[in-house]
């Protein structure tokens, strides 16, 4: 819902219809959000009307070519791709993307729904690159499981009453939950903890010779293996009692709680080692 509103506002503001998104992206399952998701299997014929061009992540020349005619209303990109396998946009790419969007009057939308709220070791993942988008979409961690979403909108946009609406964006109970989340995050220094424990975990995982590549930031980590991970995940779950996510066939996705301690990380590493060698 947050991404739907962001895309809609970008189109209202620019008067344009086309959107640029990136390969392996995931932005949602409804209407415009599913159309800018790079998975044709979940895009129904009903959703196909939106003009979307998918470009390779980190290919700034492709972006410049796509935006040169100044007919694109928005570029939407995840702070870190989650479903796509924990793909981290390069810092220089994000900086150049900001410049190209500004030069062509294109709205830059940062989807921080999975990568935001401290997950990456900063409040929003794009802050690692030091850029300022035109809109930031957020949900998931915003309510710590309680349904709520939101769009952070630049002063560039002039609000018009009734232009946008949400089901999950403004009810009193959800907002109370979101405020409580912020209080706990600040009081327990969870963003700093995600950075510290995440760096520790990534360093330790890089020592495993069986792993092809480690990607991610903070406590948003992708473990790419040389072989399919189904058997490894089953061993972790049923034998080691460790639940993990996945992306595709070869990537284990780690999204642990932001209060994960080094002791918790060591326990995971021990059980991960057991599963690898079982």
For each feature predicted by the language model, list its residue ranges.
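Conserved N-terminal phosphate-binding loop of PLP-dependent enzymes in the Aspartate aminotransferase
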Residues: 1-278
């Amino acid at each position: 819902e947050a991404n739907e509103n962001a895309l809609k506002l970008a189109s209202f503001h620019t008067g344009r219809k086309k959107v640029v998104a990136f390969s392996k992206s995931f932005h949602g399952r409804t209407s415009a959000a599913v159309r800018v998701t790079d998975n044709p299997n979940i895009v129904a014929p009903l959703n196909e009307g939106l003009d979307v061009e998918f470009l390779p992540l980190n290919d700034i020349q492709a972006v410049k070519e796509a935006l040169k005619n100044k007919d694109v209303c928005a570029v939407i990109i995840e702070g870190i791709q989650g479903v796509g396998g924990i793909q981290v946009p390069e810092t220089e790419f994000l900086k150049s993307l900001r410049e190209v969007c500004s030069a062509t009057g294109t709205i830059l939308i940062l989807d921080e729904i999975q990568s935001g709220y401290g997950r990456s070791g900063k409040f929003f993942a794009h802050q690692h690159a030091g850029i300022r988008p035109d809109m930031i979409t957020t949900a998931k961690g915003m309510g710590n499981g309680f349904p709520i979403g939101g769009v952070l909108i630049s002063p560039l946009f002039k609000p018009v009453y009734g232009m946008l609406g949400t089901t999950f964006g403004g009810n009193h109970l959800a907002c109370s939950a979101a405020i409580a989340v912020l209080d706990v995050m600040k009081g327990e220094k969870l963003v700093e903890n995600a950075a510290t424990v995440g760096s520790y975990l990534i360093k330790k995982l890089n020592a495993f010779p069986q792993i092809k590549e480690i990607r991610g930031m903070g406590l948003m980590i992708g473990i790419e293996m040389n072989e399919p991970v189904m058997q490894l995940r089953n061993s972790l779950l049923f034998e080691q009692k460790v639940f993990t996510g996945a992306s595709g066939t070869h990537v284990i996705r780690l999204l642990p709680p932001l209060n994960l301690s080094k002791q918790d990380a060591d326990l995971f590493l021990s059980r991960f080692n057991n599963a690898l060698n079982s």
